[in-house]
Swiss-Prot record:
Subcellular location: Host nucleus, Host nucleolus
UniProt xrefs under InterPro entries: IV_Tat (IPR001831), Tat_dom_sf (IPR036963)
Gene name as annotated: tat
Protein name: Protein Tat
UniProt function note: Transcriptional activator that increases RNA Pol II processivity, thereby increasing the level of full-length viral transcripts. Recognizes a hairpin structure at the 5'-LTR of the nascent viral mRNAs referred to as the transactivation responsive RNA element (TAR) and recruits the cyclin T1-CDK9 complex (P-TEFb complex) that will in turn hyperphosphorylate the RNA polymerase II to allow efficient elongation. The CDK9 component of P-TEFb and other Tat-activated kinases hyperphosphorylate the C-terminus of RNA Pol II that becomes stabilized and much more processive. Extracellular circulating Tat can be endocytosed by surrounding uninfected cells via the binding to several surface receptors. Endosomal low pH allows Tat to cross the endosome membrane to enter the cytosol and eventually further translocate into the nucleus, thereby inducing severe cell dysfunctions ranging from cell activation to cell death. Through.
GO biological process: positive regulation of viral transcription
Region (Core): 67-77
Amino acid sequence: METPLKEQESSLESSREHSSSISEVDADTPESASLEEEILSQLYRPLEACYNKCYCKRCCYHCQHCFLKKGLGICYEQQRRRTPKKTKANTSSASDKSLSRRARNCQPKKEKKETVEAEVATDLGLGR
């Protein structure tokens, strides 16, 4: 019973050695090493600023920065926040003034409309 197990272990070891030797041969080629370095440098390179403001499909896929910002809508810049307006001591009096101004402005417009309608009605009666 010990012999089949030893045979399996030896076959596994030989296959591991064979696979590791293949991967070492592939990694040792100078072309693949330079290609890997180039890919890694592109991966860790910061995104270049692109000032194109067009949102068409072609411009959205122009570069990685445009795709993230325009295509996906992801923006890592700090959001501008509005400063809170200074509140006055008498907020109720300020709101009363604005309401009274609104009421004053609306009333004359209604009167003008009524007078225009009355003139039009009298003109139609005379023409017939």
